[in-house]
Structure formats: structure tokens, C-alpha cells
Amino acid sequence: MSAVNSEATTNLLAEFQKLRGETIGLHSIFSEKSTVDISNLNGNTTLKRIEDSCEELKNEIREHVQVSSDELKSIRTANSGFLNKIEESLKTSQQEAREDLKAIEKKNESLLNKSLNELKFQKEQLKYVEATLISQQKLIEHMAKELTGKSISDMVKNNEDDGTHFEFSHTFNSVATLEKGVERRSELKEGCGSLNWFMSIKRERPSRKLLVYLNLDCEKLPTNNWIIEADIQCTLNQYYFNEWVRKFERKEDAIFKCENGEYTDKLVFNFGEYEEILRTFTKNGVWNIEFDVDIIKTVGLSKKKLRCFDESAAEVSDAVMIVKDEKFHVSKMFLAAQSSNFKLLFKNSNNSEFTLDGINSEDFQCFLELLYGEPALTGRLLNN
């Protein structure tokens, strides 16, 4: 409807402009004729007729202009009503949009407040957990100092041999007089629990090789089946300017194992000819060798206990904790002071024996050793 009204208005305006132009032309002609003396003209009747025609034309133009003006007013009135409807519709749409926007803002504000409250609650929980951990750490540190006179950090520093990594070296004398087929051994080195390790050298026969061995002391080996996987580095040191200097290194992946109580494995390093080693690495027949042992995995071997909680501790204990059929003799008062869980457990029961589920005996042994001030926290355990 808007397009039809616009087109009609345009047509009327164009016709009006055309009539206006014609009227201006006629007025111009009449202006020129007005300067001529009518008395000098012949044919007064003709002139009169022209004047009458012009007058009629003027009247027609006036009527036409009046009609066009009325139609234009009608169109304007119709357009005004249409524009009012559009304006009202626009106002209604704007109002609805504002209401929708307010509803969305209110909903988002509610969600934001809920999220902020949840974050605040989580932050408070985190602060509580952090404060609890700090409190427990201080308590354990205090207990460690009370029992051992050392802080936990000092115990970790002093506990370089954590059972999973150890180093040892040995200096062999009179290597130049070593006979073929004879094996010369070092002192024992304890590592990986209660196992004893040693190194040895042997001049092979009939070849001219000098071999270096890393081995386990068979006299103290467990008789059950077990396996040790390790990364081992052997270093030959050279005597240089009155000191031994690391000169030649070799690394090997090794597996030591015992099957049915029989141990036969040992690691062998072949560094070359006997005479070449004497020339390069010995000083007056003295030869220094180092081993760096990193235990990767053990199966069938238990960690060396730093404190006993067996029957020998029963006299100074008033409770027995049973973990996987293994009994640990402990003090109720001591454990209750370290843990609210133990405190609640002992408070709600008059029993002297308690069974703990969901934990293995080795982990509980380590836990008790830590509480009793033993250096159970090693560098590797802290990293894990």
C-alpha cells in the first residue's frame, strides 16, 4: 500500500509541475501583449475571444490545482496514518526487546553470582586444606626434631642412598701383578634394601682382556624368586696431577635375578687389553673404578625396614594395626596426635587390635617410619 501511495503522489506532483510551467508561459505572453495598444489592433472580437479562452484556461487550471491539492492532502493523511502504525509497531518491538534484554541481564547476573559464590566456597575450601597441610607438616617436622634432633630436610639430605640409587668406588692395588684367571674383589656395598654388592676385576685366560664385574653377595641373597632391573654406569678413572680424574665411562642395562633359589647373573664390562689398561688407567699398579647404580624396578624384594614394629615393640605399645595379615605394634596416643582419623578410631572403640583396609603393608611401614622420625622420605619419594 505504501508503494501505491508513493507512486500516485509522484504522478500528481509531476502533472502539477507541468501545469505550473504552462501557466507561467501564458502569463509571460499576456505580459508582452499588455504593452500593445489594443485600439491599434484590428479584430477586437478575436482578441476578446482569446482573452475569454485564457480566462477559462485559468479557471480550469485553478480547479485542477485545487483537485490535485486535495488529493495530495488525502495521500498525506493516508501516509500519516500508515507511518503512525509503523511508529507504534516499532515502539512495541523496542519495548519487547528492552524487556527481553533486561530478562537476559537478570538471568546472567544470577548465574554470575552463583558462579562467584561457588568460586568463593572453593577458595575457602582450598585455604582450609592448605592450612591443614601446613599444620600437619609443622607437626611432623616438630616430631622429627623431637625424636631425632634433625629436621626432615636434613634427613633427606643425609639419606643420599635411598635404596634405589647408590654409588661406590674401589681402588685396586698391584694390578700389574694380577695373574691370569684370578678374580680380585672389592669390599661389600649395601644397596637396594639389604642386598650387598661388590665389584671385581679378572684377567682372562687365554685372552689378554681385563674384565670388570658388578655382582651380588650370594651369602645374603633372598632364597625366593626375585628380579632387579637397573641402569648401571661404570667409570674408569685416570690418575692425573695427583688425583683421580673421570676418564672413560660405559653404561649398561642390567637384569639381576634369582630363580628357585639359584642366582647366577652378574654384569661384565670389557674395557680392552690388559696392557693398554695398565698403560692408560693405572698409576704404579693402582687402578680406581666407580659404579653408579640406578634401580629401575624390583620384583620379590622388600625394602629394608628402618624401624621394627613387630613383637619386639610390643612392650612399648598398646595397639596392634593389622595390614594384609601383618601386625604393627604402635602407640594409640602417638598415632592419635598425628591424625584425626586415628583419634576417632581409638575413641569409638576399646579394642586393642584394628584392621586397616585399602593399604599395603610396605606403605604403612613407610608411613609409620616417617611418623616415628625415621628418614623414610627420600629424594625420589619426594619427587613422586
From Swiss-Prot:
Residue ranges annotated for the MATH domain, each copy included: 167-277
Domain BTB stretches: 317-380
A Pfam family per the record: BTB
Entry-linked InterPro entries: BTB-MATH_domain_protein (IPR052664), BTB/POZ_dom (IPR000210), MATH/TRAF_dom (IPR002083), SKP1/BTB/POZ_sf (IPR011333)
Bilayer-crossing regions: none
Keywords: Coiled coil
Coiled coil: 41-127
Source organism, top-level taxon: Eukaryota
Protein name: BTB and MATH domain-containing protein 34
Chain's gene name: bath-34
